[in-house]
């Protein structure tokens, strides 16, 4: 083989290995990306037809939180549509009616069974002496 052909072969093999590495890394990271869907997106598409976990985010509707013996149920909205969420576990401290949450779980018929709840907080920090009620 000529030197030119060896260099070309080395370059092609290097790019092929690099490309495969990128594909493997992106495939592994796919499940950890923190995007979420709104209730409108979930209800309008067949997003939940597969058995993969999805994240859904929205505001907890006031008056919708119901505590049962072993789980809690509530409705979230994106100010267009609403969806029922069922959760069994310890709620985050920032969980309250009117606050925004992101829930991770699966759709079962028309209800969302959450495995994890993340409460979103206000990005505007105010020291307690300046807070107004």
From Swiss-Prot:
It is a single-pass type II membrane protein. It comes from the Bacteria. SUPFAM superfamilies: Heme chaperone CcmE. GO terms for cellular component: plasma membrane. It is found in: Cell inner membrane. Residues 29-133 are periplasmic. Its main location: membrane. Gene3D superfamilies: Nucleic acid-binding proteins (2.40.50.140). Heme binds at residues 121, 125. GO terms for molecular function: heme binding; metal ion binding. Keywords: Cell inner membrane, Cell membrane, Cytochrome c-type biogenesis, Heme, Iron, Membrane, Metal-binding, Signal-anchor, Transmembrane, Transmembrane helix. The chain crosses the membrane at residues 8-28. Residues 1-7 are cytoplasmic. GO terms for biological process: cytochrome complex assembly. Pfam families: CcmE. The keyword Heme applies. PANTHER family: CYTOCHROME C-TYPE BIOGENESIS PROTEIN CCME HOMOLOG, MITOCHONDRIAL. HAMAP family: CcmE (MF_01959). Belongs to the CcmE/CycJ family. Heme chaperone required for the biogenesis of c-type cytochromes. Transiently binds heme delivered by CcmC and transfers the heme to apo-cytochromes in a process facilitated by CcmF and CcmH. This is Cytochrome c-type biogenesis protein CcmE. It comes from Ehrlichia chaffeensis (strain ATCC CRL-10679 / Arkansas).
